[in-house]
Amino acid sequence: MVPAAITNIHEAFKEIKHMTIDTWQEECRLAARRAMKEVIEHRMHNGIDAFLEQMRDAGLPDRRNGSFSSHLVTEVGNLELRIPRTRTFSARSILQGFARRTASIERTILMCFLLGLSTRKVGPALLSILGEPVSPSTVSDIAKQLDQSVQAYHQRALSDHYEVLIVDGIVLRRKTGAGAQRRTMLVALGITPHGKKEIIDFRQVPGESKTAWEGFLNHLYQRGLQGDALKLVVVDGGNGLLAALDLVYGQVPLQRCWAHKTRNVLNHVKQGDQDKVKRALHRISHARTLREAQKAAQRFVLQWEGSYPKAVECLQKDLPELLSFLQVKTGLLPSVLRTTNAIERRFREVRRRSRPMGTFSDRTSMERILYAVFMHENLKQRTATPFLLLTQND
């Protein structure tokens, strides 16, 4: 694995420290418990050594006197620990001090991997951050289980209850043997009849070609998302995506994103007229009925065709698909249906949280970070799949 390109590790931890670890697969939590056990028991043994040295310096002889079992409840589960003791002292006080730090330690162990640190570099990073060593075998075990969690997410069965599907791509920079290169992540977000938004899946590809999109969408279809409940697919355009959607979800009405279309139209308008044109477009996109929107579009053409024929052409060529949201029967708000804003907000979160890391170190680090951010966002919507129930998403 290529070493991570992290500009400032402390800033990186600061950015992602609030991400939850509640959704990690049980095997990953087991590995984290093992690492916690090593860290805490090492600290207790060091504490006993320091105590015995102090006693010798004071002329008060003492010696080790075995250990006893104790439990510590943590975010990743119950730890069974061996508490070392001497004839006059036990390390229980050290354990009590650690009880106040367990949450941050657990997150630190997992976040080292989310940050894209190589297995070789996680141990030294943990030593500098925690002041405690974690064995290479434990580090390797955590990395393996974390990646298994990501793969389980990509392979889980999908239910077919979404009313709206939003699909888009995000471009990120990744290190390769030929230097930093741009890599595209294809992402699908579903919206339930109750308005809950969930990142369904993502896939890393070289670019947004028809073949790449078709493979991604077919994988969703084969896992259960066959589109029987879908009323709308929202996109920002792209010939490859449109061709793939026609093959996989051709029966579902297509909605073009009004935010993207507005920007594209304004590209053909002089700066001094952009506010007026934008207001005219707003009257179309925010019309309450299809008929009202069509009339507003007619007025737009009459008003601006002479001055900005390319702007008018840009609008007219996609107008039917821009107004699809006014023709579907759903309880969802129009603001949810007419743009890809829901998925764009999550893309901004990915960029914000990954900015301190610079360029992603490799494909694995990119997968881990997107998985962590998207699971965090899904949890806020109460749509994250518990990993013990990965056979079917909610």
Outline where the language-model segments fall.
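Short alpha-helical segment immediately N-terminal to, or the first helix within
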Residues: M111-L115
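Short, conserved DNA-binding cores of transcription-related domains
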Residues: M1-Q96
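RNase H-like nuclease fold core
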Residues: R64-N65, N78-R87, S93-S104, T108, ...
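DNA-recognition alpha helix
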Residues: R120-G131
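Conserved beta-strand -> loop -> alpha-helix junction used to position metal-binding or nucleic-acid-contacting
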Residues: L232-N239, A244-A280
